[in-house]
C-alpha cells in the first residue's frame, strides 16, 4: 500500500497518488447522521452548502495519508505517516493529543464514545520479511492511551467499521474480521482468500464487503457465515449503499449494480464510462462517482436522471447533505458542491493547492474538513459580526 512521507518531491508524490487513485479507493469513507459506523457520506443539517464557506482553521502537516480521518460529535482523529494519529477539536482545531504507534497506519480509523480504533502494520514489502504484521488497537478518547491491542498476521486495509458492538475490517490476507469493540476479543473471522481494500457496511443482521477480485460478499454479522456473493469483473473498493432490501454498489468494471439484499440476485445494472469509485443513496436516488470524471444521478430503479462532469477524477466518497454533495476532484484546487436536484454547481471550497489525496471529506457539526497534501482544512460559515453599539 502506498504511503506518503515528507521527503517526497512534489512531482513524484503527485504521480504516485495519481496511480494510487486509479487502483485503490479508500472509503470513508462514515454515516454522519445518527449512525457514524458505516460509509462516510451523509452530513448532518448544520452544514449548509448553499452559503459561502471559509477556512475557519487549519492543521499543518506534510505527513497526511490517503486515509479518511475518524470523528465523533466533537473531535477529529487525523491519520499521519509513521504510525501517528492526532486528536483535534472540530470547532477550533485545538490539539488534544498525539499518539505515535510506530509502523504505518493501514486503514481509515473509526471512532465512538470510547475513543478511536486504529489499524496499523509493521514491516515493509521490500524489507525481506515474508509477511507484514498487522495490529488493531483502541486509543482512549481523552489521552490517546492504548486501551487494548490485538495483533494480526496481516494488516487490515481500506477502512474500519463499527456496528452492533463489534468492529469489522477486511485484511490483505483475504480474511474478514469481527472484534468486540469493548475489549478487542475476536468474535469471528471468515477466510475468503482474495484480499480486501474496502469498507465493510453493517445493515441489520448483514455485513457487506467488496473484494479485490470483484465479488460483493454478504455475511451474517453475528456469526461470520457467508450468506451469498455476487461476482463482477472489477475490484469493488467503495462502500455499498442499501435500503428497502436492496444493496447498491459500484465496480471497477464500470457498472453500478442493484442486488437483492436477501439472496444477492441482480435487479439491475447500469454502465458508466469508467470504474465506479463511490455510490451513495440520497433520499430516493443514487449518486455515483466514476473515474470518467462524471458524477451520475440514478433513480433507485436505475434510470439516469443527470450526469455532470467535474474537473478531475473522483477517488473518494462525497460528503452529502439534504441540499448538495461535496466532491474532491483529483488535480483540481477546490472541492466542488453539486446540487442534488439537478447537478448544477452551487459552491466551491478552495484548498489553495492541487487535490492529491483519496481521503474523503467529513463534517463535525457545522465544520467541513478536507485532508490535503499539507494538512487538514476546516471550512465553516463566516462568523456573524457582533452588532455595533
Task: Name the predicted role of every residue range.
Residues 32-63, 94-101, 135-140, 145-152, ...:
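Aromatic (tryptophan-biased) beta-strands that constitute blades/sheets of beta-rich domains
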Residues 1-10:
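N-terminal secretory signal peptides that target proteins for export/translocation
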Residues 35-38, 62-84, 103-136, 150-177, ...:
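Repeat-blade elements of multi-bladed beta-propeller folds
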Residues 52-57, 322-350:
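Short, positively charged, low-complexity/disordered linker segments
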Residues 15-27:
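Bacterial N-terminal signal peptides
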Residues 89, 140, 180, 220, ...:
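Structural recognition of the beta-propeller blade-terminating site
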Amino acid at each position: 500500500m502506498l504511503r506518503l512521507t515528507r521527503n517526497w518531491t512534489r512531482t513524484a508524490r503527485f504521480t504516485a497518488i495519481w496511480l494510487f487513485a486509479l487502483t485503490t479507493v479508500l472509503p470513508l469513507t462514515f454515516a454522519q447522521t445518527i449512525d457514524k459506523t458505516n460509509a462516510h457520506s451523509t452530513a448532518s443539517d448544520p452544514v449548509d452548502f448553499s452559503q459561502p464557506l471559509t477556512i475557519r482553521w487549519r492543521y499543518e502537516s506534510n505527513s497526511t495519508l490517503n486515509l479518511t480521518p475518524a470523528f465523533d460529535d466533537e473531535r477529529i482523529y487525523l491519520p499521519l505517516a509513521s504510525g501517528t494519529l492526532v486528536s483535534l477539536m472540530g470547532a477550533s482545531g485545538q490539539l488534544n493529543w498525539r499518539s505515535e504507534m510506530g509502523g504505518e497506519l493501514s486503514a481509515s480509523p473509526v471512532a465512538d464514545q470510547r475513543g478511536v480504533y486504529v489499524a496499523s502494520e509493521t514491516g515493509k514489502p521490500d524489507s525481506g520479511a515474508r509477511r507484514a504484521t498487522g495490529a488493531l488497537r483502541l486509543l482512549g478518547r481523552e489521552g490517546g492511551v492504548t486501551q487494548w491491542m490485538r495483533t494480526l498476521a496481516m494488516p487490515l486495509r481500506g477502512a474500519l467499521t463499527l456496528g452492533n458492538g463489534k468492529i469489522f475490517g477486511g485484511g490483505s490476507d483475504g480474511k474478514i474480521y469481527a472484534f468486540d469493540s469493548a475489549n478487542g476479543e475476536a468474535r469471528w473471522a471468515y477466510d475468503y482468500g482474495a484480499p480486501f481494500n474496502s469498507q465493510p457496511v453493517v445493515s441489520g443482521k448483514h455485513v457487506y464487503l467488496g473484494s479485490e477480485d470483484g465479488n460483493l460478499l454478504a455475511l451474517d454479522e453475528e456469526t461470520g457465515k457467508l450468506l451469498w456473493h455476487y461476482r463482477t469483473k472489477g475490484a469493488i473498493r467503495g462502500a455499498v449503499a442499501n435500503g428497502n432490501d436492496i444493496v447498491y454498489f459500484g465496480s471497477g468494471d464500470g457498472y453500478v449494480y442493484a442486488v437483492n439484499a436477501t439472496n444477492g440476485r441482480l435487479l439491475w445494472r447500469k454502465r458508466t464510462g469508467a470504474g465506479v469509485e463511490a455510490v451513495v443513496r440520497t433520499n430516493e436516488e443514487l449518486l455515483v462517482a466514476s473515474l470518467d470524471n462524471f458524477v451520475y444521478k440514478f433513480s433507485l430503479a436505475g434510470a439516469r436522471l443527470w450526469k455532470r462532469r467535474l474537473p478531475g477524477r473522483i477517488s473518494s466518497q462525497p460528503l452529502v447533505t439534504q441540499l448538495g454533495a461535496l466532491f474532491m476532484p483529483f488535480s483540481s484546487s477546490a472541492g466542488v458542491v453539486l446540487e442534488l436536484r439537478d447537478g448544477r454547481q452551487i459552491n466551491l471550497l478552495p484548498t489553495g493547492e492541487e487535490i492529491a489525496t483519496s481521503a474523503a471529506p467529513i463534517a463535525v457539526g457545522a465544520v467541513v474538513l478536507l485532508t490535503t497534501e499539507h494538512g487538514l482544512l476546516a471550512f465553516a460559515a463566516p462568523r456573524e459580526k457582533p452588532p455595533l453599539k
